């Protein structure tokens, strides 16, 4: 947890969208992820898209699992609803949020370890049910939070920091989602 806070003063020249909000109104907390981590780019893209489309932040539900990627929902849409679920179980929790309030726009954030390992069954069934949600998988082929073990999506033959090769074929979540009937991949 960081104790660094973002200033709440808005620059007078920041563009304002149809809701009277600036891009800063769609941001969240200061990131605590490693410098250069691609997960921050995902958060920045969500902030930009929601601001440009004038989507009201309070109409979003963000749910994540466990891992580096699951820290990212706190970095975007600060005025939205959020929940960190247990490892691999984000799809069930966001399905519940979706069923409880059909007016919410649901974003599920998960990592490759969270979705392709312990949560693979959950991933398959939420896609098969065609739950109305955006399911983001931040896939870097590694368990970054625990410092570098291969995830189930890592390419065969890749080597770890210690030079050990990955002996297994990767699970291709994109192909699996398409095979299960996902409409937007």
What are these regions (language model features)?
Residues 66-142:
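Thiamine diphosphate
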Residues 150-185:
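Conserved thiamine diphosphate
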Residues 40-45, 57, 88-92, 121, ...:
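Conserved active-site and cofactor/substrate-binding residues in soluble primary-metabolism enzymes
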Residues 59-62, 104-107, 132-136, 175, ...:
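Structural motif
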């Amino acid at each position: 947890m960081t104790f660094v806070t973002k200033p709440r003063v808005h620059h007078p020249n920041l563009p304002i969208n149809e809701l009277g909000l600036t891009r800063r109104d769609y941001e969240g907390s200061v990131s605590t992820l490693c410098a250069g981590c691609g997960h921050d780019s995902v958060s920045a893209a969500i902030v930009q898209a929601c601001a440009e489309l004038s989507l009201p932040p309070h109409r979003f539900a963000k749910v994540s699992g466990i891992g580096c990627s699951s820290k990212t929902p706190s970095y975007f849409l600060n005025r939205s609803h959020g929940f960190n679920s247990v490892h691999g179980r984000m799809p069930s929790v966001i399905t519940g949020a979706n069923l409880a309030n059909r007016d919410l726009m649901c974003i599920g954030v998960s990592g490759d370890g969270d979705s392709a390992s312990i949560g693979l069954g959950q991933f398959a069934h939420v896609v098969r049910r065609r739950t109305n949600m955006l399911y983001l998988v931040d896939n870097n082929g590694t368990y970054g939070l625990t410092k570098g073990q291969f995830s189930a999506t890592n390419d065969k033959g890749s080597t770890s920091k210690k030079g050990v090769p990955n002996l297994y074929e990767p699970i291709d979540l994109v192909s699996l989602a398409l095979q299960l009937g996902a409409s937007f991949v």
